Amino acid sequence: MEEKWKKVNPVLPLDYPDPDVIRVDDTYYMVSTTMHFMPGCVILRSYNLADWEIYSYVYETLELTDQECLKNGKNAYGQGMWAATLRYEKGMFYLIFVANDTGKTYLFRAPDLKGPWQKNEIEGFYHDCSLLFDEGRAFLAYGNRQIYVM
């Protein structure tokens, strides 16, 4: 093996749980659960799946709740955003995830990963959901023992 391709684990020095990776042209992008950390929903970039850099964040603060703003003795530790899915379709990036502290599903979209991101809320908690695109239609798939599509 050539020395320039030899990598040692961990490739990333931090914990990036629930990763989702897409490729757009010659670039890979990864999102990961960031839970209660702000700014939230980190997006990493790589050209070879071994060397990653922080590229952007989707939001500064998800909601202005006491938990997320650390007010009135409250916090969102271990809560926040979980299990993001990143997709690219017809020149637009889409990102969907749930937030344990708000009990909502959030759908963001932007033409560029640096933003600005348009935030939409979906009532309901669709944990581990995924976005699928087929013939110009978008679908949200979720479930554990049974798979649901909306």
Language-model regions, residue ranges each:
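Carbohydrate-active catalytic/glycan-binding domains of CAZyme proteins
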Residues: M1-M150
